[in-house]
């Protein structure tokens, strides 16, 4: 009797869906099922017709969009040419992760579940809809659903009786074995870095470009609550090209102080070199990690010790702990009944992995190095809208960065890893300051026809991609650029004020501003749109304008859509149903595009 084979495929934007997928993989191995865990876009989707048992774990991003690492799969699975019997041999389940404060809550999971049924798949259970807004987080829905799922799988796909389960509390074998080198290898610092300063091909996540920082300038006033930076990189000889609307991905590093503290708490020699040996055949090396590598480089450039740990972190840490009191507490925090306490201890105050390890020093000091890559996730790249055009700034790339800093009940303020790291970089210091980065196409696409007007609505740092678009269109001689820009105060966070005003004086730009804190009643961009309803309607309906929106995903898309609906009804004399259909047509024809973030 063969061991049943399970495939777990995930689409993850922030790491939560990947974490849940890895957790399912560990539970499968405990039950002695054969199991593979892969990102959807790294899996050869043509093989799906031969898979008997698949669990899909997928997040919903933005306004109902699939994560970046499942977009190719998403396009393929919705091909109209796929036969309705394509997946008739597959049993499947879909676990979704979303946020019920957004209109399209778990849209990706729901739509994928329906599509798999259309293609002949058999659903083991209704889809699980994890909700970030629940007081206990997604686990409130996931835990009971996963329990039912394993019951069903083990009945339908029984394991041979002579193969016992691995009990909880016993750690599974690590994915890799750390082989520490006795002699220091003769390699340079460049080879130890995850990125290159002289790429042969366009840079990518696996081979970023080390871009020198040219300028790092604060662009908010001294009294403004937030530090916002305009940062410029030199991309000479990088093979990087980009257009307005594209996105740059940046791979941050942990601070020297945190890296040193981590090595001390775990009793690691930061200067020790190592290579990795997979424990099982066919396991690929960790992506983007050079070998041989030093412990210092692993911790500073790869392990996300500044992230807030998930429940699975506590589960594995409890298995590894040899200290009775600490182990008992870790077991409690990782149990189903301990989720409220875990929320209060970790999620609510945004306590980091490093801080948790400091709270459990006996356990941390005895963690076998082999488990570091199982225990701690990889640092994830952060995406930024490119805020400049190569036509205006050749061989340069600019971004606008809001530095994340906030206070919780913990004594130390919370800092965003990437934004704080970028803000700390000083291009004036001795030697070049370099940042690993690469570029990908963004979600915004601008019209090439010279006489097509564009309406851009940008709130705060959401204006960044529109600066790139305006620079590009001006270089091509395209007029008809209408920018609705919203910020708090004219003298504190009016980004590129002088630049916009010069373009307006020359006839290249029509600028409409909304300063929300300069009067008693707050004024936002949606109010300015309503005030200029006749102009907006004439541009959209009379001149075929494209409409763009960028900013925070929580309220802005809904507020702006409601303003547009009002304009369509008042200026276009459309009924509510016709106005809704008009807005839908704009979206379908890419004449209404959004780039939003949570």
Swiss-Prot record:
Binding-site residues for FMN, renumbered to this chain: 12-17, 59-62, 97-106, 132
Q: Where in the cell is it found?
A: Cytoplasm, Perinuclear region
Q: Does the keyword Zinc apply?
A: no
InterPro entries hit by this protein: CysJ-like_FAD-binding, FAD-bd_FR_type, Flavdoxin-like, Flavodoxin/NO_synth, Flavoprot_Pyr_Nucl_cyt_Rdtase, Flavoprotein-like_sf, FNR_nucleotide-bd, NADPH_Cyt_P450_Rdtase_alpha
Keywords, ordered alphabetically? Cytoplasm, FAD, Flavoprotein, FMN, NADP, Oxidoreductase
**From its record, what is one biological process in GO terms?**
electron transport chain
- Mind telling me which SUPFAM superfamilies this protein's record contains? Ferredoxin reductase-like, C-terminal NADP-linked domain (SSF52343), Flavoproteins (SSF52218), Riboflavin synthase domain-like (SSF63380)
Which reaction does this enzyme catalyse, per its entry? 2 oxidized [2Fe-2S]-[protein] + NADPH = 2 reduced [2Fe-2S]-[protein] + NADP(+) + H(+)
Q: Where does NADP(+) bind?
A: 461, 516-517, 522-526, 559
Q: Which family does it belong to?
A: Belongs to the NADPH-dependent diflavin oxidoreductase NDOR1 family. In the N-terminal section; belongs to the flavodoxin family.
Q: What does this protein do?
A: NADPH-dependent reductase which is a central component of the cytosolic iron-sulfur (Fe-S) protein assembly (CIA) machinery. Transfers electrons from NADPH via its FAD and FMN prosthetic groups to the [2Fe-2S] cluster of CIAPIN1, another key component of the CIA machinery. In turn, this reduced cluster provides electrons for assembly of cytosolic iron-sulfur cluster proteins. It can also reduce the [2Fe-2S] cluster of CISD1 and activate this protein implicated in Fe/S cluster repair. In vitro can fully activate methionine synthase/MTR in the presence of soluble cytochrome b5/CYB5A.
Protein name per UniProt: NADPH-dependent diflavin oxidoreductase 1
Annotated gene? Ndor1
């Amino acid at each position: 009797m063969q061991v049943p084979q399970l495939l777990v495929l995930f689409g993850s934007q922030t790491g939560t869906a990947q974490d849940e997928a890895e957790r399912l993989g560990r539970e499968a191995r405990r039950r002695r099922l054969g199991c593979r865990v892969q990102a959807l876009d790294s899996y050869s989707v043509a093989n799906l017709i031969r898979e008997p048992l698949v669990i899909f774990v997928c997040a919903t991003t933005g306004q109902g969009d699939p994560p970046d690492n499942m977009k190719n799969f998403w396009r393929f699975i919705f091909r109209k040419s796929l036969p309705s019997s394509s997946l008739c041999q597959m049993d499947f389940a879909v676990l979704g992760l979303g946020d019920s404060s957004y209109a399209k809550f778990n849209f990706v999971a729901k739509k994928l579940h329906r599509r798999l049924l259309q293609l002949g798949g058999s659903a083991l259970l209704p889809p699980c809809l994890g909700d970030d807004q629940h007081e206990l987080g997604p686990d409130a829905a996931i835990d009971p659903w996963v329990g039912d799922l394993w019951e069903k799988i083990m009945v339908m796909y029984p394991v041979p009786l002579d193969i016992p389960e691995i009990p909880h509390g016993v750690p599974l074998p690590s994915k890799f074995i750390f082989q520490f080198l006795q002699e220091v290898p003769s390699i340079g610092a460049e080879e130890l870095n995850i990125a290159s300063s002289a790429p042969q091909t366009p840079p990518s996540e696996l081979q970023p470009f080390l871009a020198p920082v040219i300028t790092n300038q604060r662009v908010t006033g001294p009294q403004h609550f937030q530090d916002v930076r305009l940062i410029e990189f030199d991309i000479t000889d990088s093979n990087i090209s980009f257009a307005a609307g594209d996105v740059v991905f940046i791979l941050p590093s942990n601070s020297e102080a945190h890296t040193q503290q981590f090595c001390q708490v775990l009793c690691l020699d930061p200067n020790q070199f190592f290579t990795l040996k997979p424990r099982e055949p066919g396991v690929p090396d960790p992506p983007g990690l050079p070998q041989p590598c030093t412990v210092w480089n692993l911790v500073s450039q790869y392990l996300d010790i500044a992230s807030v740990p998930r429940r699975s972190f506590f589960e594995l840490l409890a298995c590894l702990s040899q200290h009775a009191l600490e182990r008992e507490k870790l077991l409690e925090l990782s149990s189903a009944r301990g989720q409220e306490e875990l929320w209060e201890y970790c999620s609510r105050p945004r306590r980091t992995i490093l801080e948790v390890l400091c709270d459990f020093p006996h356990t941390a000091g005895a963690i076998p190095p082999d488990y570091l890559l199982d225990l701690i996730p990889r640092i994830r790249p952060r995406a930024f809208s490119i805020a400049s055009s190569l036509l205006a700034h050749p061989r340069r790339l600019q971004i606008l960065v809001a530095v994340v800093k906030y206070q919780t009940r913990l004594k130390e303020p919370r800092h965003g890893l990437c934004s704080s790291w970028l803000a700390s970089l000083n291009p004036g210091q001795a030697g070049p300051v370099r940042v690993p980065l690469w570029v990908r196409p963004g979600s915004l696409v601008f019209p090439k026809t010279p006489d097509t007007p564009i309406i851009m609505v940008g709130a705060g740092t959401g204006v960044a991609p529109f600066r790139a678009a305006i620079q590009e269109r001006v270089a091509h001689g395209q007029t008809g650029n209408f920018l609705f820009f919203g910020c708090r105060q004219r003298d504190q966070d009016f980004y590129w004020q002088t630049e916009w005003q010069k373009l307006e004086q020359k006839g290249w730009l029509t600028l409409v501003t909304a300063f929300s804190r300069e009067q008693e009643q707050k004024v936002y961009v949606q109010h300015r749109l309503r005030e200029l309803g006749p102009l907006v309607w004439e541009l959209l309906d009379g001149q075929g304008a494209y409409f763009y929106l960028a900013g925070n995903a929580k309220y802005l898309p809904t507020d702006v859509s409601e303003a547009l609906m009002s304009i369509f009804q008042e200026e276009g004399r459309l009924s509510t149903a016709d106005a809704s259909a008009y807005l839908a047509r704009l979206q379908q024809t890419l004449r209404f595009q959004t780039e939003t973030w949570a």
